[in-house]
Amino acid sequence: MTLFAEIRDTVLAAIDTLVADNVLPSGLEMRAVTVEPPRDASHGDMATNAAMVLAKPAGMKPRDIAEALAAKLADDARIDTVDVAGPGFLNLRLSGDVWRGVIADALTQGEAYGRSKIGAGKRVNVEYVSANPTGPLHVGHTRGAVFGDALASLLDVAGYDVTREYYINDGGAQVDVLVRSVYLRYLEAHGQDVAFEDGTYPGDYLIDVGQALKDKVGDAFVDKGEQFWLAEIREFATEQMMDLIRKDLALLGVEMDVFYSEKSLYGTGRIEAAIDDLRGKGLIYEGYLEPPKGKTPEDWEPREQTLFKSTEHGDDVDRPVMKSDGSWTYFAPDIAYHFDKVSRGFDELIDVFGADHGGYVKRMKAAVSALSGGDVPLDVKLTQLVKLRRGDEELKMSKRAGTFVTLADVVEMVGADVTRFHMLTRKNDAPLDFDVDKVREQSKDNPVWYVQYAHARIKSVLRKAEEAGMSPDPANLNAVNDPAELALAAKIAEYPRLIEIAAKGNEPHRVAFYLFDLASDFHGLWNKGNAETHLRFFQDDDPSATSGKLCLISAVAIVISNGLGILGVTPVDQM
């Protein structure tokens, strides 16, 4: 339980006492009562809306309830002061012992500090990246990979049982384009001059694949019609691309639990089973769709089609699952894939898509709702575009890929840790500027450096203390008593609450934002110590005070390390 949850329980207990004293009526609904940090830190350590929430159902003025609550809460030893503000908000200021207790908890729990049980072991499938197996991952895939991986780690820390999954789109026409492109590189490996036409993949990454194919089959396919080699090369080319993609993911430290092939859905009865499930629920019918306004989607045709009643589950229009010629639409295997997820017993599904898939969200949610009977929620997180630049110059091309900057290019330029952290400095659905020069600056304007610098500074102080024969000792925590020090401890106390909020909203960027704020508070206290010597973490003439202050900064380092672990970033001990 977080400290904020503990204080909320204290507020609820005080309300129960007021009910028992007949100050408040019984049967009041408490769910909307909150305890959280005030918007203005000068107002106190925590604020509660209890009086505002209870006023109407109790038939009382908010301030009257607030004053009665304040009198009860003032008796709690953990609370120094209770102030009634505005129409009836309560601002609480906690005792120094509470904040020193937070420091002690962080030291005791170490890597476990901030871990939560709110997930209660629920099984969550997080599908992310899922790029077509046609080439190396590009900078847009990088954002989805980082976001999805950090989200999976966040949910794990919050007590969920997480499966990380990659859906291999190896059943569509784009793989045929890959095969034809590989064939051209294969001919090139045999010494032929080839021309890459529009619609093929010209990147240098296929040169080695063409050579590998030559080594495998010799000249068996040279100058043969594609009916002789298209199917034969398809599996080979897909495997080669997935090996490349796995290597790209490894550069970022991303490891998947499951790679699921779209092709495995065809010819196995899985698509038919999913559609039959919907048919059995009365959600499949034969009919016509009105032509859509604007651009005509690929799955629309002016003929009778097999349609899914997705409008009964929140979609704007019903969706085709089978064309008039009897072939499946693109949507059908996606339905089957999510039917498989539901059948595997997951309690919640999360899909991480690029922003260009925004139009797919409602139909996918409708499908999962129908397939699970509304029991399995699907949250679709869209990652917006990344604009890669070097100063004023936008970086668009990569010789390796032929048309785009790759994940490997980005990691080579700035490193995996910088890449991962910076990809989380904006909410996933906001566009992101990624300046490869800016992210290497050593300044407060570079969040990843600023957070890492805080951790390195702390480790430097701890090494100095160790050389002097001193170490953190919670028995001396009374030395942490200055308001600036206690404010830093209060920031540490926010971390467990932050984890729960971020996990409930599937928002790992909140962790990055919090770490920057924590680092800023730490650096601010460090700078204060330059002028006010009693705030310095290393007190040459007072070993006991030093050991107490070392506890404070050790707790900060623990939180930074734990938070960076969620983001997939390695904390540095020196810079």
UniProtKB/Swiss-Prot annotation:
Keywords (A to Z) from UniProt: Aminoacyl-tRNA synthetase, ATP-binding, Cytoplasm, Ligase, Nucleotide-binding, Protein biosynthesis
Signal sequence extent: none
Subcellular location, record wording: Cytoplasm
Reactions listed under catalytic activity: tRNA(Arg) + L-arginine + ATP = L-arginyl-tRNA(Arg) + AMP + diphosphate
A GO BP annotation: arginyl-tRNA aminoacylation
Gene Ontology CC terms, in alphabetical order: cytoplasm
SMART domains noted in UniProt: Arg_tRNA_synt_N, DALR_1
Broad class of enzyme this protein falls into: ligase
Superkingdom of the organism of origin: Bacteria
GO terms assigned for molecular function: arginine-tRNA ligase activity; ATP binding
Pfam families: Arg_tRNA_synt_N, DALR_1, tRNA-synt_1d
Residue ranges of the motif 'HIGH' region: 131-141
Family: Belongs to the class-I aminoacyl-tRNA synthetase family.
Protein name: Arginine--tRNA ligase
Organism: Jannaschia sp. (strain CCS1)
